[in-house]
Amino acid sequence: MKTLPVLPGQAASSRPSPVEIWQILLSRLLDQHYGLTLNDTPFADERVIEQHIEAGISLCDAVNFLVEKYALVRTDQPGFSACTRSQLINSIDILRARRATGLMTRDNYRTVNNITLGKYPEAK
């Protein structure tokens, strides 16, 4: 595996803040599963995200609250089937979003996991 050198002006380790992690994952989840953007939700305001993080609310619970409040319908599920599928997201959806957005790396796995689960100690 070849590693790339750090360019001048580029941070050696640019770790996103908890709010940025939520924004990245919310954008992915809302777009992929509900066809929405971050600006379509109260999470367009960083303060709302900060309040959720400080309150220890998980990302999954925050999204599912929006789904229930606004009766959102998942757009990523194929038509009707014999079994009714839930409109809510789950931990697998969040893991897939983390992988798709590059937030599944070994060096930040635990930190991102704690942030998405509402267990980020620095927020309290």
Curated annotation (Swiss-Prot):
Cellular component per GO, a single term: cytoplasm
Consequence of gene loss (knockout): No visible phenotype. Deletion of 3 type IV toxin genes (cbtA, ykfI, ypfJ) leads to a slight reduction in resistance to oxidative stress, has no effect on cell growth.
Which UniProt keywords are given for this protein, alphabetically ordered?
Cell shape, Cytoplasm, Toxin-antitoxin system
Q: What is the effect of changing residue 15 to C?
A: Wild-type toxicity, wild-type interaction with FtsZ, no longer interacts with MreB, no longer blocks cell elongation, cells become filamentous. No longer toxic, no altered morphology
Provide one Gene Ontology biological process annotation. Answer: negative regulation of cytoskeleton organization
Please provide, alphabetically and separated by semicolons, the GO molecular function terms listed in this UniProt record. Answer: cytoskeletal protein binding
Predominant place of localization: cytoplasm
Going by the entry's taxonomy, the superkingdom of the source organism is recorded as Bacteria
Residues covered by region (Sufficient for toxicity, toxin less stabile): 1-73
- Whether Isomerase counts among this entry's keywords is no
Give the matching InterPro entries.
Answer: CbtA_toxin
Cellular compartment(s): Cytoplasm
Impact after mutating residue 65 to S: Slightly reduced toxicity, wild-type interaction with MreB, no longer interacts with FtsZ, no longer blocks cell division, cells become spheroid. No longer toxic, no altered morphology
Residues covered by region (Required for interaction with MreB): 74-124
Expression induction per the record is:
Expressed in mid-log phase at lower levels than toxin relE.
Q: Which family does it belong to?
A: Belongs to the CbtA/YkfI/YpjF toxin family.
On subunit structure and binding partners, the annotation says: Interacts with FtsZ. Interacts with MreB.
The protein's role, per its UniProt record:
Toxic component of a type IV toxin-antitoxin (TA) system. Acts as a dual toxin inhibitor that blocks cell division and cell elongation in genetically separable interactions with FtsZ and MreB. Interacts with cytoskeletal proteins FtsZ and MreB; inhibits FtsZ GTP-dependent polymerization and GTPase activity as well as MreB ATP-dependent polymerization. Binds to both the N- and C-terminus of FtsZ, likely blocking its polymerization and localization, leading to blockage of cell division.
The free-text domain note is: The N-terminal 15 residues are required for interaction with both FtsZ and MreB, while the C-terminal 63 residues are required for interaction with MreB.
Q: What else is known?
A: Encoded in prophage CP4-44.
Q: What is this protein called?
A: Cytoskeleton-binding toxin CbtA
Originating species: Escherichia coli (strain K12)
Task: State the organism's lineage.
Answer: Bacteria, Pseudomonadati, Pseudomonadota, Gammaproteobacteria, Enterobacterales
